[in-house]
A protein has these predicted regions:
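Immediate post-signal peptide segment of exported/extracytoplasmic ligand-binding proteins
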Residues: 35-45, 72-74, 165-170
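Beta-alpha junction/loop-to-helix N-cap segments that form part of ligand/metal-binding clefts
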Residues: 38-40, 55-62, 70-137, 149, ...
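Short, Lys/Arg-enriched N-terminal segments with co-localized hydrophobic residues
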Residues: 1-15
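Extracellular/periplasmic Venus flytrap/periplasmic-binding protein
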Residues: 90, 135-136, 144-236
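Sec/Tat signal peptide C-region and signal peptidase I cleavage site
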Residues: 15, 32-36
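Periplasmic-binding protein-like
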Residues: 45, 95, 99-108, 128-130, ...
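Glycine- and acidic-residue-enriched helix-capping/strand-helix junction motifs
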Residues: 50-62, 180-187
C-alpha cells in the first residue's frame, strides 16, 4: 500500500498537506492500477544478492516482485550492492541520474542505508526501506520522502531488554556486529534493561566464528546472553 500511495502522490503532484488528507482514501482504494497521464513509475531496487546476507536481499527482491507482478504501470530495475556501501552509492547515483527512477528501495544493511538514503531523499526521490532502519534516519533525522516499512532498528531490542527484566535476568552479556544496526540493537536493549552488563562486544560485520566470544561469555558470570547477528552471521 505504501508504494501505491507514493506512486499516486508522484503522479498527481500532491503537496504534503493534500497528501495527508487523502491518505485514508488511497488506502481504501488499495490500487493504483491506472494513471491519467500514462506515466510508468520506475523503481530502483538496490539489495544484497551475493555474498554474506544475500538470503535477506533475495527474499526482499522476490517479495517485492510478487507484489508488483502484473502491474504494467511499474517497472523495476534490480541491482546487487554486494553488501558494499561504495557499490550501493554508485548504483543509486546511476539510477537517479541516468535511469531516472522515481523510487529507490531494497537495502538490507544499515551502513548501506546511511550511505544511500540521505542523498536520495535530498534529490527529491522517495526511499522505501524494506529492512534497514537506522535510528539516525528517525526523529530529527527523518525526511518526508523516507518511508521505513519494516521497523526502526532499536525498537525490537528495546522489547528484548524489557523482557529480560520481567524474566528476572540481572546480568546480561550482549554482542552485535560493529555497524549501525548492531549499535542500535545494543543501545535499544540497554535502554530498557535495568540489570548490569557482564560484557558488551561488537564483532566484525560478516564474522561467523565466535569461539573467542563464547569463551568470554562463559567466563563472564552472565545469567543471560543477548545478541543480534543477522543473516549468515547468526548461523553456526
Amino acid at each position: 500500500y505504501i508504494l501505491l500511495i507514493l506512486i499516486q502522490r508522484f503522479i498527481r503532484g500532491l503537496n504534503m498537506k493534500k497528501f495527508t488528507t487523502t491518505l485514508a482514501a488511497l488506502l481504501i482504494m488499495g490500487s493504483a492500477s491506472s494513471f491519467a497521464d500514462g506515466h510508468k513509475v520506475k523503481v530502483g531496487m538496490i539489495t544484497t544478492l551475493s555474498g554474506g546476507g544475500s538470503g535477506l536481499g533475495i527474499d526482499v527482491r522476490d517479495g517485492f516482485m510478487l507484489a508488483v507482478k502484473g502491474n504494467k504501470n511499474i517497472s523495476v530495475i534490480t541491482k546487487d550492492d554486494q553488501r558494499k556501501p561504495d557499490i550501493a552509492v554508485q548504483l543509486a547515483d546511476k539510477m537517479i541520474q541516468s535511469d531516472k527512477v522515481d523510487v529507490l528501495t531494497g537495502i538490507i544493511w544499515s551502513n548501506l542505508a546511511m550511505a544511500v538514503v540521505p542523498a536520495t531523499v535530498n534529490q527529491g526521490k522517495f526511499y522505501l526501506s524494506p529492512n534497514a532502519g537506522p535510528s539516525k534516519l528517525a526523529g530529527k533525522g527523518c525526511h518526508k520522502n523516507y518511508f521505513n516499512v519494516a521497523w526502526q532498528n532499536d525498537n525490537l531490542h528495546e522489547a528484548a531488554g524489557g523482557y529480560a527484566n520481567s524474566a528476572g535476568f540481572k546480568n546480561s552479556f550482549i554482542l552485535a556486529p560493529n555497524y549501525p544496526a548492531g549499535k542500535d540493537a545494543l543501545t535499544g536493549y540497554k535502554r530498557y534493561f535495568k540489570g548490569s552488563l557482564a560484557g558488551e562486544i561488537y564483532t566484525k560485520l560478516g564474522q561467523k566464528d565466535y569461539a573467542a566470544e563464547i569463551a568470554q561469555i562463559r567466563a563472564s558470570g552472565a545469567d543471560s546472553v543477548f545478541f543480534f547477528l543477522p543473516g549468515g552471521m547468526g548461523i553456526g
